[in-house]
Regions:
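Short, contiguous acidic/charged loop-to-helix segments that flank catalytic cores in large enzymes
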Residues: 65-68, 100, 113-116, 166-167, ...
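Periplasmic-binding protein-like
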Residues: 134-138
Length: 212
């Protein structure tokens, strides 16, 4: 339903480039020494699925000290996350209401995108990148120059898109927002239940606790 609503608004737009709708396009980093065993989650290509879906089994971390020094790549609620290189270039997700983490950053393989006043909706931006035509166009750009696909900032910013009138984007945002927040809430609750299961199951199997 959400994609249908998006397309009704999107295909009524005027020709533009993705950069026209962005206030921020940045990637992050990890220390040269590699990932930490714990600390602040550092989102990479291995984690990105789509909004509401995230692979927590492949989590990597950066230290709290490194996180505090970051001037780019810090994730905020409403940020759109784009996998920018490798076999799955173009996969897109979104951070919202503590999903996938209340505090996290991205590594050098992920772009953070934030909309500007011409497209004042992170939800609109997410569905724009989820659109099959735009995903294919990004992947084609990434695959055109090397054996290992990859996108640079210029290739992302110059992606041809359609840009509807601001009031149409705001109307779409108001309509879709309750559904998006509910998806984030459900995802966070599912993670809590999974964590509880993983904590209790070994204790049940060992007899440390009983269901009686």
């Amino acid at each position: 339903m959400a994609q249908v609503l998006f397309e009704q608004v999107y295909y009524d737009g005027s020709s533009a480039q993705l950069g026209d709708a962005l206030s921020t396009l940045e990637s992050g980093s990890r220390p040269k020494g590699g990932a930490e065993l714990d600390g602040i989650p550092s989102i990479g290509a291995e984690n990105i699925e789509r909004f509401g879906q995230y692979d927590y089994t492949k989590e990597k971390f950066i230290s709290h000290e490194y996180f505090k020094r970051l001037n780019r790549g810090v994730v905020h609620s409403g940020d759109v996350l784009l996998y920018k290189d490798g076999a799955y270039t173009g996969k897109v997700s979104m951070a919202l209401d503590g999903f996938p983490h209340a505090q996290c950053a991205v590594n050098e393989h992920i772009f953070i995108l934030r909309p500007n006043e011409l497209a004042p909706s992170s939800f609109f931006l997410y569905f724009l990148l989820l659109n099959s035509e735009n995903k294919q166009a990004l992947f084609s750009r990434a695959s055109s120059k090397a054996a290992q696909p990859g996108l640079n900032q210029t290739e992302v910013k110059t992606l041809p898109i359609l840009l509807p009138k601001i009031e149409k984007i705001v109307e779409f945002d108001n309509t879709i927002a309750p559904f998006m927040h509910q998806i984030a809430k459900n995802a966070n609750e599912n993670r809590k239940l999974s964590t509880l299961r993983d904590t209790l199951l070994p204790k049940l199997l060992s007899g440390e606790i009983s269901v009686n």
